[in-house]
């Protein structure tokens, strides 16, 4: 029959035909996707539920004028299965993948909430940073040259060639926000600050270097879009979803994206900033602890036995995370895909002020010449930006 876009009605028919439910079952189906690229259906029969996610042949946020390969569903399914090999507790179970329809059938996570939404509503998720830090520590180590022999890594890399979605990252994270491109989206009150960034040659030189790192450094399998909207959580559980941007890339990329989205939440949620900074600090400490233990116990690369090599690697990861965080903060403020943390601020004057702070924070992160791997740098730069008279760096 070939590819066709599912509806709530045809999704019910599909799951029955594929044997996920009995043909006589009464199934309730809702389209629940709020993302930019896919349809997501929640189906349940009163006893159990499943999720059906279907990739569209175009970017939903733009329309059919922006075509995309359906292979990203295969990328996502493959990434979830790789992640499950190392950290099954932190990803949803995959029940099936239909390549022709670009469909993934997976575990129902409706008992959990999206972290971005929960944070905005005042949730704290005490185990979030531990879980994300451990997830990244294991996945990045085991898919890097430090934990995977080079032949296997090259074969795995070949399975995650993801040109369409990598191009989105190249454009929307590293290029468009730093110039006058039509994909940008911002309030006119930000124009003078934005033009200041566009004219900052030192800033653009830094962005150029981070873009080049993303283009060329195939260090490990990265999620590629790890933000608070791609994580479900409760007070006890964390599940990382939506790795359709997965590819081999820099070790510090996912860390930077995740921390950037925490910073955006901190800008908008003054009363919970200490909770956010707790998570930033703990994410890094759990990542370092996990990565270090695996390096010592399971390192396969010859030079993992050299004691001075690990601190250099961790410093390299941290420096990259700081710069990638800067790009992401700016992108989420004025680029194509915003975050509700900022856009949801009702009072316009405050929203504009917070967005200005976000732009200056992003610039500060990019221009900061990190020495060592001091996680406090995020809090220090943040406090400077939001303090009186500290909006310019």
Curated annotation (Swiss-Prot):
Broadest EC class assigned to this enzyme: transferase
Fetch the InterPro entries from UniProt. Aminoglycoside_PTrfase (IPR002575), Kinase-like_dom_sf (IPR011009), Methylthioribose_kinase (IPR009212)
Which Pfam families does the UniProt record give? APH
Pathway per its UniProt entry is: Amino-acid biosynthesis; L-methionine biosynthesis via salvage pathway; S-methyl-5-thio-alpha-D-ribose 1-phosphate from S-methyl-5'-thioadenosine (hydrolase route): step 2/2
- Which GO BP terms apply? L-methionine salvage from methylthioadenosine
Alphabetical list of SUPFAM superfamilies matching this protein: Protein kinase-like (PK-like)
For molecular function, the Gene Ontology terms on record are: ATP binding; S-methyl-5-thioribose kinase activity
- Reactions catalysed according to its record: 5-(methylsulfanyl)-D-ribose + ATP = 5-(methylsulfanyl)-alpha-D-ribose 1-phosphate + ADP + H(+)
Family in the record: Belongs to the methylthioribose kinase family.
| NCBIfam families xref list | MTRK
Q: What is this protein called?
A: Methylthioribose kinase
What organism is this sequence from?
Answer: Bacillus cytotoxicus (strain DSM 22905 / CIP 110041 / 391-98 / NVH 391-98)
Q: Gene encoding this chain? A: mtnK
């Amino acid at each position: 029959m070939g590819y066709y876009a599912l509806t709530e009605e045809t999704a019910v028919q599909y799951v029955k035909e594929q044997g996920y439910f009995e043909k006589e079952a009464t199934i309730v189906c809702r389209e629940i996707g709020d993302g930019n690229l896919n349809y997501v259906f929640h189906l349940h029969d009163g006893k159990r539920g499943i999720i059906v996610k279907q990739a569209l042949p175009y970017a939903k946020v733009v329309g059919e004028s922006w075509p995309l390969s359906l292979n990203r569903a295969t990328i996502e399914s493959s990434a979830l299965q790789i992640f499950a090999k190392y950290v099954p507790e932190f990803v949803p179970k995959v029940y099936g993948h239909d390549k022709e329809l670009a469909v993934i059938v997976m575990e129902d996570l409706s008992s959990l909430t999206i972290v971005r939404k929960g944070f905005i509503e005042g949730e704290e998720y005490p185990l979030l940073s531990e879980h994300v830090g451990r997830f990244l520590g294991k996945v990045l180590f085991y898919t890097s040259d430090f934990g995977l022999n080079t032949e296997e890594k090259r074969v795995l890399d070949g399975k995650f060639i993801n040109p369409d979605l990598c191009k989105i990252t190249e454009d929307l994270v590293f290029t468009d926000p730093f110039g006058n491109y039509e994909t940008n989206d911002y309030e006119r009150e930000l124009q003078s600050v934005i033009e200041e960034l566009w004219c900052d040659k030192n800033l653009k030189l830094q962005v150029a270097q981070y873009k080049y790192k993303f283009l060329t450094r195939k260090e490990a399998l990265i999620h590629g879009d790890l933000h608070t909207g791609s994580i479900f959580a409760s007070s006890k559980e964390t599940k990382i979803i939506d790795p359709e941007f997965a590819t081999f890339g820099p070790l510090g990329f996912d860390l930077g994206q995740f921390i950037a989205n925490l910073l955006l939440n901190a800008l908008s949620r003054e009363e919970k900033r200490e909770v956010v900074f707790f998570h930033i600090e703990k994410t890094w400490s759990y990542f370092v602890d996990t990565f270090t233990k695996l390096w010592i116990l399971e390192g396969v690369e010859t030079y993992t036995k050299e004691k001075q090599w690990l601190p250099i690697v961790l410093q390299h990861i941290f420096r990259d995370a700081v710069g990638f965080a800067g790009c992401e903060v700016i992108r989420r403020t004025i680029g194509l895909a915003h975050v509700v943390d900022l856009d949801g601020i009702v009072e316009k004057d405050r929203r504009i002020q917070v967005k200005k702070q976000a732009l200056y924070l992003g610039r500060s992160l990019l221009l900061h010449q990190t020495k060592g791997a001091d996680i406090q740098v995020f809090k220090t730069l943040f406090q400077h930006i939001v303090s009186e008279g500290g909006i310019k760096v």
